[in-house]
Amino acid sequence: MSLVPIVVEQTNRGERSYDIFSRLLKDRIVFLGEEINDTTASLVIAQLLFLEAEDPDKDIWLYINSPGGSITAGFAIYDTMQYIKPDVVTLCVGMAASMAAFLLAAGAKGKRFALPNSEIMIHQPLGGMQGQATDIKIHAERILKLRDKLDKILAENTGQPIEKIKADTERDFFMDAEDAKAYGIIDEVLIRNKR
């Protein structure tokens, strides 16, 4: 069971209560705080599209605390971030691992942040398959293509050579916030709120 806090605001027309995520959305904050799957991606994408419709010229903040997850769901979020007009500011609060680190690096250049005690981890895609040898081969070839695509985009977003990305993602590669800044995944470690 997931508990979602409710906040109450006083207005000149009385009280209004919101779940906390709806209240954050009013401030153009989208919170990705769980594993990335199709459901999570649909929710994040819907919020990004809604905020673009509300004001296409105002930045959207994507707060990330996620262990990563599905590559295809992550690509759906990534493509939407690139598609919409507003800049998407990314901020790691806690952990951005795997696909979540990929999304962190995909924020607007100069607007990718992490809090001081955040942890970022990149690695190659994970997959599992059982079945006939031909099917296993098809899936293995697919995951290798996905790895190449992820590595290419991560190299573009970080400024690292593709060979370094491939070597570093061979196994789990952990970074603290300062390391992630030096690597090019983020642009700045935030101590105080920039908003």
UniProtKB/Swiss-Prot annotation:
Per the Swiss-Prot or TrEMBL record, the active site comprises 98, 123
Write down the superkingdom of origin.
Bacteria
Q: What top-level class of enzyme does the UniProt entry assign? A: hydrolase
**Its Gene Ontology biological processes?**
protein quality control for misfolded or incompletely synthesized proteins
Catalytic activity, as annotated:
Hydrolysis of proteins to small peptides in the presence of ATP and magnesium. alpha-casein is the usual test substrate. In the absence of ATP, only oligopeptides shorter than five residues are hydrolyzed (such as succinyl-Leu-Tyr-|-NHMec, and Leu-Tyr-Leu-|-Tyr-Trp, in which cleavage of the -Tyr-|-Leu- and -Tyr-|-Trp bonds also occurs)
Q: Which GO terms describe its molecular function?
A: ATP-dependent peptidase activity; ATPase binding; serine-type endopeptidase activity
Q: How is this protein annotated for GO cellular component?
A: cytoplasm; endopeptidase Clp complex
Q: Which Pfam families match?
A: CLP_protease
Q: Which UniProt keywords apply?
A: Cytoplasm, Hydrolase, Protease, Serine protease
Entry-linked Gene3D superfamilies: 2-enoyl-CoA Hydratase, Chain A, domain 1 (3.90.226.10)
Q: What is its EC number?
A: 3.4.21.92
Compartment annotation: Cytoplasm
Listed InterPro entries: ClpP (IPR001907), ClpP/crotonase-like_dom_sf (IPR029045), ClpP/TepA (IPR023562), ClpP_His_AS (IPR033135), ClpP_Ser_AS (IPR018215)
UniProt family annotation? Belongs to the peptidase S14 family.
Subunit (UniProt): Fourteen ClpP subunits assemble into 2 heptameric rings which stack back to back to give a disk-like structure with a central cavity, resembling the structure of eukaryotic proteasomes.
What the protein does? Cleaves peptides in various proteins in a process that requires ATP hydrolysis. Has a chymotrypsin-like activity. Plays a major role in the degradation of misfolded proteins.
Q: What is this protein called?
A: ATP-dependent Clp protease proteolytic subunit
Supply the source organism's classification.
Answer: Bacteria, Bacillati, Bacillota, Clostridia, Thermoanaerobacterales
